[in-house]
């Protein structure tokens, strides 16, 4: 699953993103952030971090540098016992 997601992200970066232009308000870009988050934290946690990042990408956010956190152990979502 991880390889498929990374392949889709690479496809987006090389074929779709150039058509949209450089309009990302964050560094690294959201697609690069997604690749790093999925590689660092695995598929589920990486997708969760990517979702949170994309939600922040809106006109009321200044953007800027937003790196993938090294640890997300403080997240309530992933600490719940099922």
Curated annotation (Swiss-Prot):
Annotated membrane topology: Peripheral membrane protein
One Pfam family of this chain: YidD
UniProt-annotated location(s): Cell inner membrane
A GO CC term attached to the entry: plasma membrane
UniProtKB keywords: Cell inner membrane, Cell membrane, Membrane
Xref: HAMAP family: UPF0161_YidD (MF_00386)
Family: Belongs to the UPF0161 family.
PANTHER family per UniProt: MEMBRANE PROTEIN INSERTION EFFICIENCY FACTOR-RELATED
Entry-linked NCBIfam families: membrane protein insertion efficiency factor YidD
Record's function text: Could be involved in insertion of integral membrane proteins into the membrane.
Official protein name in the record: Putative membrane protein insertion efficiency factor
